[in-house]
Regions:
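Beta-strand secondary-structure signal
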Residues: 74, 96, 124, 172-174
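Short helix-to-loop capping/linker segments positioned immediately adjacent to catalytic or ligand/cofactor-binding
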Residues: 45-50, 108-111, 127-132, 154-161
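Short, basic/aromatic recognition patches
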Residues: 16-45
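C-terminal edge-of-domain segments
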Residues: 1-20, 131-202
């Protein structure tokens, strides 16, 4: 099999730390920017791997800041499933987690030069299935507080019972490193548009 084009450059890229960016000019301005993206994102995608097979699961989540360290991501899924198996059988399982927001399309005179505004974060760390009931309730309470902030536990809904906890898997991702990447163009860029464009085929 012939070597791929740019083989030496690809080999160097493969040896870089996971959170390193090729385009440093588009890196997040600071860690506060990354934390804000993790707090505000509606959905995140968790990547796990088992026996060489990658697996992605998009899910609701909550990000919890830490006094020391980068913080924790909390998620939950069904009690038995691929995500639960990949994390439990590999614990502490190497995982990564991503959130992404798309902005405007930025047209150009050549197809190669088209671009897009974006803001995204990739976090790398260790995934664990949470077994302690108090910790499970803590993580689930953070998720409820994020997505149902206008409702009050005990008043508007019943918090998870022991029976409920037996039916779900709660996961904790301890973030070890992260990177953020963003591109934003001036408001007056000619022809910039939101996708899908009005009149575009559907």
């Amino acid at each position: 099999m012939a070597a791929p084009r740019h083989a030496s450059a690809l080999a160097r890229a493969a040896r870089q730390p996971a959170a390193d960016l090729r385009r440093r000019d588009r890196g997040a301005p600071d860690d506060a920017w990354i934390r804000e993206r993790l707090r505000a994102a509606a959905v995140g995608t968790l990547a796990t791997v088992r026996d060489g097979q990658p697996f992605l699961n998009a899910n609701l989540f909550a990000y919890e800041e830490a006094v020391d360290g980068l913080g924790t991501i909390w998620l939950h899924t069904a009690h038995v499933g691929r995500t639960a198996a990949n994390v439990a059988l590999g614990a502490p399982a190497p995982v990564c987690f991503s959130v992404f927001e798309m902005g405007r399309m930025l047209p150009a005179s050549r197809a190669l030069e088209f671009s897009v505004e974006y803001a995204g974060v990739v976090a790398f760390g260790s995934g664990l299935v949470v077994e302690d009931a108090a910790a499970q309730r803590h993580g689930l309470a953070l998720i409820m507080a994020k997505y149902a902030a206008h409702l009050q536990p005990e008043t508007d809904y019943e918090p998870p019972t022991d029976a409920d906890l037996a039916r779900t898997s709660v996961f904790r991702v301890e973030i070890e490193s992260w990177s953020g990447k963003t591109k934003a163009a001036p408001d007056d860029v000619p022809g910039a548009y939101r996708w899908p464009a009005t009149g575009a085929p559907t």
